[in-house]
Amino acid sequence: MALKSFNPTTPSQRQLVIVSRAGLYKGKPVKTLTEGLSSKGGRNNLGRITVRFQGGGHKRTYRLVDFKRRKFDVEGTVERLEYDPNRTAFIALVNYADGEQAYILAPQRLAVGDKVIASEKAVDVKPGNAMPLQFIPVGSIIHNVEMKPGKGGQIARSAGTYAQLVGRDQGMAILRLNSGEQRLVHGSCLASIGAVSNPDHGNINDGKAGRSRWRGKRPHVRGVVMNPVDHPHGGGEGRTSGGRHPVTPWGKPTKGKRTRSNKSTDKFIMRSRHQRKK
């Protein structure tokens, strides 16, 4: 999909750059593959804000996307590509040979009419096909990678993202991720071939604040412009730098502070994403 810019009839139109959706289906999603989605506005069940700067936005219908790809050895045909408001990537509606339908993440270069298949054995290395990592050729570009067999894809699901299979070692696959991290994943975990669709997502320009509001994003207020009652960086006469190392509103270090605490899975990370920055 190409990028689309507009004639500068207003200041926001001048700056607006969006992804063209010319090749996407214009109708409604398949009703049996959707669910209702209520807007939480960043609140929990007590009505308290747990995520700041969220609220409003357009009403959405949730599309049930198949991240597990457990329909083995049944060929499917891509009926159409669709926009999904709940994610940055596009999705594809697949009609399987037995009559079932499912949404999958659409990879790049997947077109209407293409055949896709998921299997526990080796299948063709072409976009949209899914198979265990132990059967995928080394060097392949993959997405929607499982971290535990049968759990469903968790790695490389955003627009334009991918992982690369760089090797194998004692039943484990070695993956290089977009972040630069190299990690081990069990060879029986499924992965889909190709990179995720909509790689131009990173080049869009909203053009105006209202477009963020349509997505349910409210203004993100800095701590240094608040009062002391609201934030540790607040207060002071005139503009200040905060006067201390960056902290959250609750006084915890932030901006570069390491937050990873799951030491039991450290052994699967061969090269940290932070290493290249040293």
UniProtKB/Swiss-Prot annotation:
PROSITE patterns per UniProt: RIBOSOMAL_L2 (PS00467)
Molecular function GO terms recorded: rRNA binding; structural constituent of ribosome; transferase activity
Domain of life: Bacteria
Compositionally biased region (Basic residues): 210-221
GO CC aspect terms: large ribosomal subunit
Keywords for the protein's UniProt record, in alphabetical order: Ribonucleoprotein, Ribosomal protein, RNA-binding, rRNA-binding
Residues covered by region (Disordered): 201-278
Annotated signal peptide: none
Biological processes per GO annotation: cytoplasmic translation
Assembly mode: Part of the 50S ribosomal subunit. Forms a bridge to the 30S subunit in the 70S ribosome.
Family: Belongs to the universal ribosomal protein uL2 family.
Function: One of the primary rRNA binding proteins. Required for association of the 30S and 50S subunits to form the 70S ribosome, for tRNA binding and peptide bond formation. It has been suggested to have peptidyltransferase activity; this is somewhat controversial. Makes several contacts with the 16S rRNA in the 70S ribosome.
UniProt-recorded name of the protein: Large ribosomal subunit protein uL2
